[in-house]
Amino acid sequence: MTITAGGIDLERVDYKGLAYYRHTAWDAVKHGVFTRHGGVSEAHWASLNVGGANGDDEQAVRVNHERMYEALDVNADDAVTVWLVHGVDTIVAHPPTEGQRWLAKADGIVTNQKDLPLVMRYADCVPLLAYDPVEEVIALGHAGWRGTVNGMGASLVQTMQEAYQCKPENIEVVIGPSISPENYQVGEEVVEAVHAYYGDASDLIMRDPEDGTAYFDLWSANKLDFERRGVRKTTVMGICTYENTQDFFSHRGEQGKTGRFGVVMSL
């Protein structure tokens, strides 16, 4: 099945019970935005939970990772990731040393190395997938509200520029499944942070006309962050995790009792 979002085609691929989305124009990149289907986890982690710090059985999570990598035909032993800390640091990836795939505390990873899969985990926060087809560089980021109001997207672009001489106009970005604007209620602390970083981009905050409750548009905010850094091709998939818990894990939609879905990119 293929869906069109922002002018690009996204294919939903089914593989041995797993289901994931891929950008049809990124044939040079093995990549997938995985749903929660096709794993072995049970209860509220059912079934392709790839988060290891939420109470799920460790062996089940390990099997889920292996199934995910098999679906993309990448080597599980080569995959690397980071400890997500809701910041804006981006690192340049290197192969795992002595089996240690957790490279650092960060929310962004960049590489131009082939056969070095990047993987991250999500459940409402925004997956940021970036690819420069000219310099053959990939990047993967994680943006909650803190990352969004402190420049996670900008951090990815800057690291791609500094490490690999990427030009922003050549970088293509996909903003993956995450909580939608109409479901992301926030407090005044977040509203102030949005205005501090984005200035007069008032359309990023929506107010309930009756009670004044604020809602934050993470999708448009991250897209704007990339655009301000010179990125011309940013596509929002437009899939809300909160409203689609049958396909994706959602921290808010499932009151914190949930797993994490995976995103993988590899050259």
Briefly describe each language-model feature range.
Residues 1-267:
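Active-site microenvironment for binding and transforming phosphate-containing groups
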